[in-house]
Structures are given as structure tokens and as C-alpha cells.
């Protein structure tokens, strides 16, 4: 699963180009081309270090004592291995929490990996019925690319689109259309739920799945259709009918566990899939996977897993669900 670095005219071994970094410095561009560890596709890993830092030592009188010698550049002190930009709906409180839980539990193995979140403005976060869902889709899509462009201010190397696009779209091409605009606008590759869910289910050889979503009937119908279009059989599906993005984050784990036992355990399934980035699933997976002997693929752990594996970080992790 390790990624391959393709040495080319932008690589560390043969720097022939420069670029202007956000601090205004013109410096070498040591970008690399990567073959994704899961997708096998080639994408660019940009150089976000060679132009940094511009700094100088100043004494108590305000006099400049010396310039910091940048040399070939220095990496971000905390995200020196991989800097991930994460696009998160403004109502969401679970994405960063679950991803940081995984990173903190595996401090040594993920040292130098950082996530840097940018909110997608969703001023009309209600989606309790078909009309509200359509309005929510319009607002979300209108603000997604702007959020991605804002995320570039942190100079990320790779993006994660932390959203369940199947809430809106069952068609595979429509589902990929908005994340594709993000990649085109930023020039960065992105982990999406459609990519991560498919790769995760393939890892377990799953065909029949149980689907847990926070959606209303229209959203649940879209989600079922999406996974069927990916080639999976949805043996059982449960929507929680949450009225808004904020409501999703307040559904207690005990209730989700009840739904899993009542709706999925009696059914012959290969995996449980949890959609909705504000519907926390990591603690449930850690509690139930071994007991039920069924993998629980939650969107937030799966998105981080996909981003790490695509970028060649393949070590098994603890406290992160069976997926890792």
C-alpha cells in the first residue's frame, strides 16, 4: 500500500523550477508526483516548505540582529510529514475530534501528520424533508469551492472533503462532481467518501452491507442508490431522520448501538457503513467490531485512512477501528 514517488522535473533530485510562496518568496519548487497507495493514480504532492520561513532576530530595542538563514527551507514544525487540509461543514463537531483521536492515540507512528480544518459555510443547515434537503444542497455546493480555496492559505499538501455527498446524489458521476471541482480549483488531490468507502469495503471483501445514516427518507434513498451503484447490496438501511446538521451530532452512541443491534445484527451482512460526518462512529467501532465480528466503516476514520494510505503512510494503527 505504500505510495511511489515519481522523480521528475519537480522532484527533490532535479529542481529546475521555482514558485512564489504565500510569503512572497521565490524559491525552488520541489513538488513530487505520487502514485496513490490505494487508488494507483498519479497526483501531485506540492512543495510547501522550500520558501519558509522568512524570519529575523530582533532585540529589545527593535533593532534587527540577524536574518534567519532559510537555506533549502524548513518544514512546518508540527505537520512536517504530511499536511492535510480538511473541508468540514460549519455545523460539524465530529470530523476533527475523531481524526485527532486517531492521530493522538498513535503519536509515534503519525508524528508529523497534521490536519487543518476549514469550514464550509452552511447557513441553512436544515434537511429534515426533501425541500429542505434541496435548499441545503444548493447552499453547500455554492460554498464548497470557496472553502477549498480558503484552505490553501494553510498550504496543505492533500485535501479531505469531509462530507457525505450521497446525501444529495445517488448517481456516481454527480456524486463526484463537486469534489472534482475542488480538485480542479486547488490543484490538489482529495480524499472523498465515495473513494474511501469503496476502498474500505473492498479491503474487507464486503458485498452485502448495512447502512446507517442520519438522513431523511429522501437522503436515505439517495444513499442506498449510491452504494448500489457502486456495486454493493444494501441488505438493511436505517435513517435517523435528523432535522439539521447540528442534530446529527447530538444522537447518542447508545441509540446508534441500539439501531445496529436491532437492524443489522439479525441480517447476514459483511460490513456496517456509517454515513454522515457529524454522526460519530469511532467509539462504536472500537466497542462493537470484535464483539459482533463485523467491520464498522465510519466516514471520518475511513477518510483519514484513505488520505494516509494514498500518501504512503501504511502502518497499522491502534484505537482506529479494524480498517487500520
Task: Write out the residue ranges for each language-model feature.
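C-terminal functional extensions of proteins
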Residues: 298-324
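A polyampholytic, Gly/Pro-enriched intrinsically disordered region
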Residues: 134-142, 206-217, 254-265, 315-324
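N-terminal glycine-rich anion-binding loop in soluble enzyme alpha/beta folds
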Residues: 35-145, 215-220, 224-252
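N-terminal glycine-rich phosphate/adenylate-binding segment common to multiple enzyme folds
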Residues: 140-188, 192-195, 274-282
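Gly/Ser/Thr-rich loops at beta-strand to alpha-helix junctions
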Residues: 88-94, 163-172, 214-219, 277-282, ...
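Short, acidic/small-residue loops that bind anionic groups at enzyme active sites
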Residues: 176-201, 290-307
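Hydrophobic alpha-helical
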Residues: 258-288, 303-304
Amino acid at each position: 500500500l505504500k505510495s511511489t514517488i515519481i522523480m521528475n522535473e519537480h522532484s527533490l533530485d532535479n529542481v529546475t523550477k521555482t514558485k512564489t510562496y504565500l510569503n512572497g518568496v521565490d524559491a525552488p519548487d520541489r513538488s513530487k508526483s505520487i502514485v496513490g497507495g490505494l487508488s494507483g493514480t498519479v497526483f501531485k504532492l506540492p512543495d510547501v516548505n522550500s520558501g519558509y520561513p522568512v524570519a529575523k532576530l530582533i532585540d529589545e530595542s527593535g533593532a534587527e540582529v540577524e536574518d534567519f538563514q532559510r537555506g533549502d527551507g524548513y518544514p512546518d514544525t508540527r505537520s512536517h510529514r504530511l499536511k492535510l487540509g480538511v473541508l468540514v461543514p460549519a455545523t460539524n463537531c465530529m470530523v476533527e475530534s475523531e481524526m485527532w483521536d486517531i492521530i493522538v492515540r498513535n503519536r509515534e507512528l503519525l508524528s508529523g501528520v497534521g490536519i487543518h480544518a476549514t469550514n464550509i459555510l452552511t447557513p441553512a443547515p436544515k434537511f429534515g424533508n426533501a425541500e429542505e434537503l434541496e435548499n441545503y444542497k444548493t447552499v453547500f455546493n455554492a460554498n464548497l469551492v470557496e472553502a477549498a480555496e480558503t484552505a490553501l492559505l494553510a498550504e496543505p499538501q492533500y485535501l479531505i472533503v469531509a462530507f457525505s455527498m450521497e446525501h444529495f446524489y445517488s448517481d456516481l458521476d454527480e456524486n463526484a462532481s463537486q469534489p472534482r471541482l475542488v480538485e480542479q480549483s486547488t490543484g490538489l488531490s482529495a480524499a472523498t467518501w465515495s473513494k474511501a468507502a469503496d476502498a474500505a469495503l473492498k479491503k474487507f471483501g464486503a458485498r452485502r452491507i448495512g447502512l446507517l445514516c442520519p438522513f431523511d427518507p429522501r437522503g436515505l434513498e439517495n444513499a442506498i442508490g449510491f452504494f448500489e451503484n457502486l456495486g454493493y447490496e444494501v441488505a438493511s438501511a436505517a435513517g435517523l431522520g435528523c432535522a439539521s446538521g447540528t442534530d446529527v451530532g447530538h444522537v447518542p452512541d447508545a441509540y446508534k448501538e441500539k439501531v445496529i443491534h436491532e437492524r443489522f445484527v439479525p441480517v447476514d451482512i459483511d460490513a456496517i457503513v456509517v454515513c454522515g460526518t457529524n454522526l460519530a462512529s469511532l467509539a462504536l467501532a472500537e466497542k462493537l467490531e470484535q464483539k459482533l465480528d463485523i467491520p464498522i466503516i465510519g466516514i471520518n476514520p475511513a477518510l483519514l485512512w484513505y488520505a494516509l494510505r494514498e500518501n504512503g503512510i501504511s502502518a497499522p494503527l491502534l484505537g482506529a477501528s479494524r480498517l487500520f
